Each structure stands twice: as structure tokens, then as C-alpha cells.
A protein has these predicted regions:
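Conserved functional loop/turn residues at catalytic and ligand-binding sites
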Residues: 33-36, 142, 155, 263
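Alpha-solenoid HEAT/Armadillo-like helical repeat scaffolds in large eukaryotic proteins
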Residues: 104-111, 149-150, 185-193, 226-230, ...
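Core helices of alpha-solenoid repeat scaffolds
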Residues: 98-103, 139-145, 176-187, 217-225, ...
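N-terminal "cap/leader" segments of large eukaryotic alpha-helical scaffolds
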Residues: 2-130
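Onset and early core of a folded interaction/catalytic domain in large eukaryotic regulators
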Residues: 94-186, 234
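Alpha-helical solenoid repeats of the armadillo/HEAT superfamily
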Residues: 73-79, 113-126, 155-168, 178-181, ...
Length: 346
């Protein structure tokens, strides 16, 4: 949708800015209409953790403590008032955005040829999707499939914002029925993206929400090895997110056969160490506890022992190093970790 069709509909630029400002994107849409582009700042190498690639981030100002600033880690564009008269409109709640404005955003998304503009629109839609009423409206407008179409966008930042928007939409159970068909594409993004990238993190967040209930967990049964491999090559933030998915899956007894026979890197067991970050170690112990609660028959156990490098042999077999490592963790300074270890060993 170009300038000529938007401006007459809403009268003037102030009105248009007011429409989407509550969704945290007035400045971004102003740039979209005016043909401008938003700036990106590259983080300096000095501020990056070792082994983490430099990432480009949208130059925005967050509203500290706001709801949207906490939802799925999405950045929120701070509205910039055009004048005093429009200030009240600009600070509307994203939950009060009108249906026709959501339609307009989806239409703009489909017609935009500019990657920064697509990012800004997806960011706005993602912020709107933090509210149930908008989650339902976007689904009814077939917006889920419109948004998901950008999972294959050639620009990485567009794919990240697409995943973030789908993640918020996924908090709605009805929306999950529409989003589940994109699981293979999301898994491919994880596998093909650079290690420790924003793309991997955003994709894992989406899979976490999708795997909270048992209904769609079977869609991930072929991805166990991929998830286990991520544990040994990624930074803490991605390890935590990966373990959230694994804990969800291992909480379902129907998934256990697929989990224990999946090929697993032997180095997974090395993470059960006092030097591992507590946030990672606690979830590892929860995952291990779920595995320990599984009781295979003698015949099944014998069959699994013949599967070289499967998770059963790495973590559950008598030959595994896990038991000795758990004993060492009984002296961990974190009391919660001690309790988790004691529960597994008893």
C-alpha cells in the first residue's frame, strides 16, 4: 500500500501515526510512509562475548518495564510525539488498536519491497500480538500465513522479526493449529543459521511455546539430536532456551522412546559440572530427572545398549559417566542444584 492510498484514508500524517503508535511503532511507520529507513548500529567487537558473532540491532528506545518490552524479548519502539495534540493518541495501548489498522499493516507487509520497512511492520505486528484480541484478529484476517511467509525472506533480520511475531501469536492455542505447519521450516532455520545467532534464539523461543502442551510435541521427535547438539556448541542463552524445549518434550511419556534412542553427542554429559552456569545446570538436571523417571523393560534397555551413541547410552546406561558427575554436584554451592541432584540419585 503506497502513500497515495494511505494518506487520504486517514486524513493526515498525525492520524496515521496515532493509529499504530500504541503498538510501539509510530516512528517506524512514519519512516515507512515517508520512504525513510531506520538505522542500525553494529555492536562493537569489544562488547561481544567470545565466539558470538556481531549482531545488528534496530536503533530503538525501549519503554522500561512496559509489558511489550518483556514479551518474548521483543524490542519496543518508543513513540515520538509529533505535537501535543497527538500525544494522547500516540500513547494508546496496543490492545486497543482497531481491526482495520491491523489489516492495513498486513497489507503494507505484503507490498513492502524494503527490508527495514518489513522489519518495522513485523515488529509492530509482533507487539500487537502480545494481546489476545489482536491474536484472534490476526488469525481471522489470515495474517498468520502472511507473516509466516517471511520465514524465507533473504534478510536475516526480517526472519528474526517474523519468528518473534509468530512466537507471540503462538501463545494463543487456536493459533498454534495454524503455526504448527511451519515447524519443519523453523527447524531448518535452526540447523542452517549461524551458531549463537538471533535466528536460532528466536526459533527456539517459538518451539518452546509450541511444545508447552503435548498436542504438537510429536512434530519435534526428529529434532532431538539437533537440540542435543545445540547444547554443546552454544552460549548460555541458547542453552537455556534449548533445554526449555527438551524439558517440555521429556515431560511427555509418549515422547520418551524417541528421546532416549536419538543419537547424542557424548560431550552432553560433560555439562553436568560445577562450572556450568546455574541456569543451564538446573534445567539439565530437570531434563535428566525426567529421563531417570522413565523405566524401560529389560528387553528395551538391551536393545538401546546396542544403539551406539544414543542418548540412553550417554546418560542412562550403567556405563554412563552421569552418575559419578551427579555425586560430585552434591557439594554444589547452590542449594537448589543440590536438591535436584539428590532427587535424581534417590
Amino acid at each position: 500500500m503506497g502513500d497515495g492510498s494511505i494518506t487520504p484514508r486517514f486524513g493526515n500524517m498525525k492520524a496515521l501515526l496515532g493509529i499504530v503508535a500504541g503498538a510501539g511503532a509510530s516512528y517506524g511507520l512514519y519512516k515507512l510512509i515517508s520512504g525513510g529507513s531506520f538505522k542500525r548500529n553494529k555492536k562493537s567487537a569489544a562488547t561481544q562475548s567470545p565466539g558470538v558473532r556481531n549482531r545488528e540491532t534496530i536503533d530503538v528506545t525501549l519503554q522500561p518495564g512496559s509489558l511489550l518490552a518483556r514479551v518474548s524479548g521483543l524490542d519496543v519502539v518508543c513513540p515520538r510525539p509529533v505535537d501535543v495534540a497527538s500525544a494522547d493518541i500516540i500513547h494508546q495501548s496496543p490492545g486497543n488498536i482497531d481491526p482495520q489498522h491491523l489489516k492495513m499493516l498486513l497489507s503494507c507487509l505484503q507490498t513492502s519491497n524494503n527490508p527495514p520497512d518489513r522489519c518495522r511492520i513485523l515488529l509492530t505486528l509482533g507487539n500487537c500480538a502480545a494481546f489476545t484480541v489482536n491474536q484472534n484478529l490476526i488469525r481471522e484476517f489470515e495474517g498468520i500465513h502472511t507473516i509466516a511467509g517471511f520465514l524465507s525472506d533473504p534478510v536475516a533480520e526480517v526472519r528474526v522479526q517474523t519468528l518473534n511475531a509468530l512466537n507471540n501469536l503462538c501463545m494463543n492455542i487456536q493459533n498454534q493449529e495454524h503455526i504448527k505447519i511451519y515447524v519443519p521450516q523453523v527447524l531448518e532455520l535452526i540447523e542452517m543459521s549461524p551458531v549463537n545467532s538471533d535466528l536460532q534464539l528466536a526459533a527456539l523461543r517459538l518451539l518452546t511455546n509450541l511444545s508447552v502442551t503435548d498436542k504438537h510435541q510429536h512434530l519435534l521427535k526428529e529434532s532431538i539430536t539437533l537440540l542435543l547438539s545445540l547444547l554443546v556448541v552454544t552460549i548460555e542463552e541458547l542453552q537455556v532456551q534449548t533445554l526449555k524445549v527438551l524439558v517440555n518434550l521429556s515431560s511427555n511419556p509418549d515422547m520418551m522412546d524417541d528421546i532416549v534412542q536419538a543419537p547424542a553427542p557424548a560431550s552432553v554429559v560433560l555439562l553436568f559440572d560445577a562450572r556450568t552456569a546455574p541456569a543451564v545446570l538446573l534445567r539439565l538436571l530437570t531434563f535428566a530427572g525426567n529421563l531417570k523417571d522413565w523405566r524401560p523393560s529389560a528387553q528395551v534397555a538391551d536393545e538401546l545398549r546396542r544403539k551406539q551413541d544414543c542418548l540412553f547410552r550417554v546418560m542412562l546406561d550403567e556405563s554412563s559417566q552421569l552418575h559419578s558427575r551427579l555425586v560430585q554436584l552434591l557439594s554444589h554451592p547452590d542449594g537448589e542444584i543440590q536438591s535436584q541432584v539428590a532427587r535424581i540419585l534417590t
